[in-house]
Amino acid sequence: MIQGTTSDAGKSTLVAGLCRLARRTGARVAPFKPQNMALNSAVTANGGEIGRAQALQALAAGIEAHTDLNPVLLKPTGDRGAQVIIHGKARANLDARAYHDYKPTAMRAVLESYGRLRGAYDAVIVEGAGSPAEINLREGDIANMGFAEAVDCPVVLVADIDRGGVFAHLVGTLACLSDSERARVRGFVINRFRGDPALLEPGLRWLEARTGKPVLGVLPYLHGLTLDAEDMLPASARTSAARRDAGVLRIVVPALPRISNHTDFDALRAHPRVDFTYWRRGPVPDADLLILPGSKNVLADLAWLRDAGWDALIKRHLRYGGKVIGICGGMQMLGRTLADPHGVEGAAGATSAGLGLLDYATTLTPEKTLVNAAGRLAFGGDARVAGYEIHMGRTEGPALASPALMLAGRGGERPDGALSADGQILATYLHGLFDTPHACAALLEWAGLDGAEALDYPALREASLERLADTFAEHLDLDRVFAAFA
């Protein structure tokens, strides 16, 4: 089991790289995260929902993603509550106190999934959540040491040296554990190191002498990886185009407080002719294309957009010929009205006017749509698209008579989304819109980029997984790492 001293220490990446290394040996290996809290999720082949990081790890392991890889997924709906997803299906919206009481039920689901994986694979590489040293969360823990103790699982502790204080993080984390939990820790991995490793040696020797635990490797800071993020938005809000000789498209996406599935934009951030910005505050940069992303709380995020002046900004952008895309929650915001009669996102009966840019209305519903989908753009040469739908809502109205996409359905094609009569606004429920090379190129050309290249994002992701595994093979003591898991 890989645990971390902090969130974003590198647990997900370490598990992905180890899965790829184990796959190279011919072993059948599965990733596993007992409990994940994230708004980036993926749809499995059997119609369930898991954390995006576990889908990436499954790709690294060469197996099909399924709900046992992440039996408990928590999707925050606000500062104090989350939607609880068990074995891929939404069960309830609970606040923190109610979820604490629900943990025994969640733990049963975790142990069921782990048992099935242990029976089906040669090895299971487990990822913890956050830190095992969160004292207030230790009672009834199912994500870190509580799980490790329950199944007698050895632990490797990873820490991020780039943020500073790595030795205090490691020693302090051990100090917060019980004697039996400390004994379970087999060693440390230090992540994101920059500089001369020889200068780190005195610190490593001190750490090993102080704790009696070995350092199993020091991983360098890897720039330019193209891998799906578990949850956090990139630290750098802006990505500049690598090529400016043939023209550049400027894209701006508002960093909504409850933004979900922002992995939709990874292909755009990697495109050599795209200037990409996540807008957080201050003046909004000039843009050719504005994209409203998915949201786990559409009504609250729409109010946030209005408070930030984006309703007027979008209308001005359209007057000057700009293009707008709304994806999932962003699609719902573009319509006339939104209604939440069942209290899916908050108080039952809440309603809000939408941005009024497309003639349809959305009603939020308790039933969640979870489906992988493929088809074509309904314009621009019928470029093929493939992605997935994750939403709780039904959208109806005249604008849907001019769909943005045609997706494969039972007995033929089914329409999805809307394209405005003037061709400036595109709305869709499909996540992963830009991941398919020719669809990405067609959409960038629609938005104004002449001769847009067909960037093969899946190939970039695969190359990053290979690079990750090569780096781990060079910088980890793999004999001791895999011995720790034996």
Curated annotation (Swiss-Prot):
<dbReference type="Pfam" id="PF07685">
    <property type="entry name" value="GATase_3"/>
</dbReference>
<dbReference type="Pfam" id="PF01656">
    <property type="entry name" value="CbiA"/>
</dbReference>
<dbReference type="InterPro" id="IPR047045">
    <property type="entry name" value="CobQ_N"/>
</dbReference>
<dbReference type="GO" id="GO:0003824">
    <property type="term" value="F:catalytic activity"/>
</dbReference>
<comment type="similarity">
    <text>Belongs to the CobB/CobQ family. CobQ subfamily.</text>
</comment>
<feature type="domain" description="GATase cobBQ-type">
    <location>
        <begin position="248"/>
        <end position="439"/>
    </location>
</feature>
<feature type="active site">
    <location>
        <position position="431"/>
    </location>
</feature>
<dbReference type="GO" id="GO:0015420">
    <property type="term" value="F:ABC-type vitamin B12 transporter activity"/>
</dbReference>
<dbReference type="InterPro" id="IPR002586">
    <property type="entry name" value="CobQ/CobB/MinD/ParA_Nub-bd_dom"/>
</dbReference>
<comment type="pathway">
    <text>Cofactor biosynthesis; adenosylcobalamin biosynthesis.</text>
</comment>
<keyword id="KW-0169">Cobalamin biosynthesis</keyword>
<protein>
    <recommendedName>
        <fullName>Cobyric acid synthase</fullName>
    </recommendedName>
</protein>
<keyword id="KW-0315">Glutamine amidotransferase</keyword>
<dbReference type="InterPro" id="IPR033949">
    <property type="entry name" value="CobQ_GATase1"/>
</dbReference>
<dbReference type="InterPro" id="IPR029062">
    <property type="entry name" value="Class_I_gatase-like"/>
</dbReference>
<comment type="function">
    <text>Catalyzes amidations at positions B, D, E, and G on adenosylcobyrinic A,C-diamide. NH(2) groups are provided by glutamine, and one molecule of ATP is hydrogenolyzed for each amidation.</text>
</comment>
<dbReference type="GO" id="GO:0009236">
    <property type="term" value="P:cobalamin biosynthetic process"/>
</dbReference>
<feature type="active site" description="Nucleophile">
    <location>
        <position position="328"/>
    </location>
</feature>
<dbReference type="InterPro" id="IPR027417">
    <property type="entry name" value="P-loop_NTPase"/>
</dbReference>
<dbReference type="InterPro" id="IPR004459">
    <property type="entry name" value="CobQ_synth"/>
</dbReference>
<dbReference type="InterPro" id="IPR011698">
    <property type="entry name" value="GATase_3"/>
</dbReference>
